[in-house]
Swiss-Prot record:
Native species: Macaca fascicularis (Crab-eating macaque)
InterPro entries from the UniProt entry: eIF3f, EIF3F/CSN6-like_C, JAMM/MPN+_dom, MPN
Modification Phosphoserine, positions: S50, S262
UniProt family annotation: Belongs to the eIF-3 subunit F family.
Source taxonomy: Eukaryota, Metazoa, Chordata, Craniata, Vertebrata
Protein name per its UniProtKB record: Eukaryotic translation initiation factor 3 subunit F
């Protein structure tokens, strides 16, 4: 499999340089890279027409063209074809919603990285609607970086995306992620490639080095900047990152959080009865908090909040009104059914064990 190579330095591909910027919080222009024969870099823009006579005279005729055609104004670059995700302005009020599986997958890829690799990169997948951009899946992409160039296995990325579409056809390419706390010049080159896969791609950075004592997670979207008719740059503007989860993901996150209090960072799986007991304890704690808040409001210690009051009223109205005697009857009936199922399961297990012994005689 051929690995496309993107050079991070060298002369510009066209007479007019097309610099891009790679700041983490500010913009700075760098010369556009010159792609290798199998390069995957975004082609540099065609030279813009200049009103300077000296600049026009310095333009040489291409092979097969007359001097008149060589001095004609350069054509405007064709607009990029729209991708499947993030159409138009960034939706959702510039908010990106991340699921816990994304962070777990990124950290796992970083722990399994090749020897000598400073960071890992990958593709972000998810869904887009009018109100939010939700990142629900991702996969890592092999790459190599040096001071002068970056090589990304883009064929691998395309094949992985095709496989993901067979399982989750609704997931689209939203952008890419990288481990680290800043944005480098190589990040700009990789971002240009993903700009061809999806308009307004998201760049997610995860600080796995824990420089500030915590895993900083930031999201950016690129914005063109510069003087019209001159060299253009790219500025990465931050986005708001929020966390979303499904019920099954929340259970896993709660279990992982328990390892924070374990000396060896290992915790065993609890039984069904223990899970029911833990859930009941959490509900009791929540009810105690709500009751204390209501008492503080009635006593004047805390000012009333209309939003909280409406939410509590809606919650109370959702509780079905059942006579205590009827509720006890229903509970006892369910318990009897559960005990009967348990008894039959144990009886079946005993019969199977007895049958195996009779067969082996």
């Amino acid at each position: 499999m051929a690995t496309p190579v993107v050079s991070a330095s060298g002369p510009p591909a066209t007479p007019a340089p097309a610099p891009v910027a790679a700041p983490a919080s500010a913009s700075a222009s760098v010369p556009a890279p010159t792609p290798a024969p199998a390069a995957a870099a975004v082609p540099a823009a065609a030279p813009a027409a200049s009103s300077d006579p000296a600049a026009a005279a310095a333009t040489t005729a291409a092979p097969g063209q007359t001097p008149a055609s060589a001095q004609a104004p350069a054509q405007t670059p064709a607009p990029a074809l729209p991708g499947p995700a993030l159409p138009g302005p960034f939706p959702g009020g510039r908010v990106v919603r991340l699921h816990p599986v994304i962070l777990a997958s990124i950290v796992d890829s970083y722990e399994r990285r090749n020897e000598g690799a400073a960071r890992v990169i990958g593709t972000l997948l998810g869904t887009v609607d009018k109100h939010s951009v939700e990142v629900t899946n991702c996969f890592s992409v092999p790459h190599n970086e040096s001071e002068d160039e970056v090589a990304v296995d883009m064929e691998f990325a395309k094949n992985m995306y095709e496989l993901h579409k067979k399982v989750s056809p609704n997931e689209l390419i939203l952008g890419w992620y990288a481990t680290g706390h800043d944005i480098t010049e190589h990040s700009v080159l990789i971002h240009e490639y993903y700009s061809r896969e999806a308009p307004n791609p998201i760049h997610l950075t995860v600080d796995t080095s824990l420089q500030n004592g915590r895993m900083s997670i930031k999201a950016y979207v690129s914005t063109l900047m510069g003087v019209p008719g001159r060299t253009m740059g790219v500025m990465f503007t931050p986005l708001t990152v929020k966390y979303a989860y499904y019920d099954t993901e929340r259970i896993g996150v709660d279990l992982i959080m328990k390892t924070c209090f374990s000396p060896n960072r290992v915790i065993g799986l609890s039984s069904d009865l223990q899970q029911v007991g833990g859930a009941s304890a959490r509900i009791q704690d929540a009810l105690s908090t709500v009751l204390q808040y209501a008492e503080d409001v009635l006593s004047g210690k805390v000012s009333a909040d209309n939003t909280v009051g409406r939410f509590l009223m809606s919650l109370v109205n959702q509780v079905p009104k059942i006579v205590p005697d009827d509720f006890e009857t229903m509970l006892n009936s369910n318990i009897n059914d559960l005990l009967m199922v348990t008894y039959l399961a144990n009886l079946t297990q005993s019969q199977i064990a007895l049958n195996e012994k009779l067969v082996n005689l």
